[in-house]
């Protein structure tokens, strides 16, 4: 992270991963522990939503975010095709068990394994050391991330093809064969809010899987061509810069997801998320429900869709602010100077 020339900078507990910036082993431990927290939250929240679920009320009116996602991918239905929550408790418990495994893994990497991967006795592990200003090191690690994303897309495509996912057009779970029409995939990047074909949705994921796995293999296998010049980022590439890139990506995805969730009822079926939302403008854009739920069990009187869309949008907005903050710091701007140095005299005139 940006230290402004101070070699002895220290970080408080609230600084998160900043304290393990140059300790790749501890960095991996933090990643594993974070995965455990996510698994615990998913498992615990799913059990809580299942315990309070009322089959007499539409799921989208009960603020059941985790149940809605499971129902969308065809989980929880009985043999007659009705959603009963079958198997959902088992999935939640598996997540809770995995959270303990991930937690133990985080402790193992944090306490017993080397703090920096470059000190490891395993040659393959040493390849995952962190050299923030080394593009060959960063592209190698990026390639592995892309491979995981690509495999996840394949899992989703194959799950939909073999098991099936919920299709709101027929109100039932069905098997979906992906449509790998490149023209259709290209065009949907401009009208994805209105996409109404699960085949096209799965085709997009299949195409993404190809791009990400190909890109991952490319990044792992290749090194930078030519000299690492200032034009290519020499002197700029750093932990702070890469954090800013990550914040930008998360922010952009969150904003896109917010608009998609608010309007699209194919990927986000009304049966599970509630009715489509109405876009409003105040200090910032926001969405409101198109139905009145003030007397229902939903939190704050809103549908699951309203909660997802608005939370995604505002988190995305703040992630984009985080991107600007960290990008400026990576470029050398010291925000503390604003408080330390007096303003120009002409500002007081």
UniProtKB/Swiss-Prot annotation:
One of its GO terms (molecular function) is chlorophyll binding. It comes from the Bacteria. The keyword Nucleus does not apply. The gene is pcbE. This is Divinyl chlorophyll a/b light-harvesting protein PcbE. Pfam families: PSII. It is found in: Cellular thylakoid membrane. The antenna complex consists of divinyl chlorophylls (a and b) and divinyl chlorophyll a/b binding proteins and binds more divinyl chlorophyll b than does the antenna complex from high-light-adapted Prochlorococcus. Its main location: membrane. It comes from Prochlorococcus marinus (strain NATL2A). The keyword Thylakoid applies.
